[in-house]
């Protein structure tokens, strides 16, 4: 017989009494009746009918008391999650984006004005937009280029952002219609009486050059631009008129002084002054004028250089050495001026004459504080008080073999070793209040830091001096630029520079055939030419390819030299076989004109006398 187990339905189903009494609810977990008051019942019914969620904490606590500990924890967590979800979430802004996303967004902008405006927004935008702003540079003024070279020497980290520089568009300071205006003024000078004032107004339109930046702080040169003088006539009529005007001016002054003694006018003046003080005039601040700095005018003592657009050789050498990641260098149609390099042993004597003093001393510290992510305080970075961090980092990087530098490094590692030492006081963190009480640093420290500033070289164009002792100077030639390009961008890994892709040396009058051969020989590795072979019958424009591997480099030598249409002054594209053959012929001095090349082909085609007959 199959025995059936008895099932207790009361343990699973609610009692019948709970269905009849609306003031009670049955809990299926504890199998007990939960009494509910009328006030709580009305709240539950209103919630079930679609009303607002107005349940109180008392109803929830009645049900929670009947549950186990685990259920209590889960219910508490659910309440916390619900409260946080209902809270207002902060909106996600641009600053919360990762740096990679911001760099991609700024890369799509491609606008110089937009990058300049972004640098004024916040510190994060400044750090992201600065590399894009300095990536592609082109100059039209020698004054602005001189300022930029000095800024590179003050802050060499900017040179890592530069990839393209264009100096082919540099112009002189005179306006385009300056010559026509001078001719018209010369013609009308004899007939009109305002000739001198017109000429001075036209002179004031001439823009400043790099020499104005060089002699900016030189006391021998006036800082003021050309003065607007007035013409003086020696006629008797004008003198009588001037005497009458002076007498009338004296009478007006006396009348004004007497008017102050009248009480009525005094009250009016006082009331008008009080009104002006109570209600000052409204002024609007235009942030757009912050960077609209007009170009300075030429100095009156440098008018002889108004039509020149030359640049010193030292500036170009600074540009090449301080920009290691440059890809495109355009020096086409650029005129160079002579320059001199100051000897290393006498460089420290001219520290006070350097053009880096044209900028404020806190410029480098401010820029480093903005670009540094791990700076301790904004006060130190903005005002340049972090002397331990900014001023002496070059000593540890450059590994100077000097006893004084070793003492500096030892004192930096143990700043509290000797309290009486000058170095321990100098390397301690200064206080703004007692900054003037600190002892001055010894001159050897300033000399070492100055000699290692930038690329470690100082030229005569970097000083606000016109001349000095010839024993301290070594003259620079134009070939130093070619040697600097080949030295900075050639590497042992490959035959060419890893980054340099375009060099424009077109319309260079000083460039000769021998200098071009040396420059191309330094850039191109000779190992490439040993296994290659060019026959005499093969021309530059022939279709047969050689074993030379093409490189991504273009060198423009067109219209260079003292004559036009020279055989070696051509565009050399090493991506093509024609350019690779041409560069080999230039190095081997085997470039011929069209007539000589035709005669060579004819001689090879006909052969020697009797050779074809015997064959």
UniProtKB/Swiss-Prot annotation:
InterPro entries membership: F-box-like_dom_sf (IPR036047), F-box_dom (IPR001810)
**Could you tell me where the Basic residues compositional bias lies?**
264-278
* UniProt domain F-box: residue ranges: 91-137
Q: Spell out the residue ranges making up region: Disordered.
A: 172-198, 264-291
Give UniProt keywords alphabetically: Ubl conjugation pathway
Q: What does this protein do?
A: F-box protein probably involved in ubiquitin conjugation pathway.
> What is the official name of this protein in its record?
F-box protein COS111
> Which organism is this protein's natural source?
Debaryomyces hansenii (strain ATCC 36239 / CBS 767 / BCRC 21394 / JCM 1990 / NBRC 0083 / IGC 2968)
Organism lineage: Eukaryota, Fungi, Dikarya, Ascomycota, Saccharomycotina
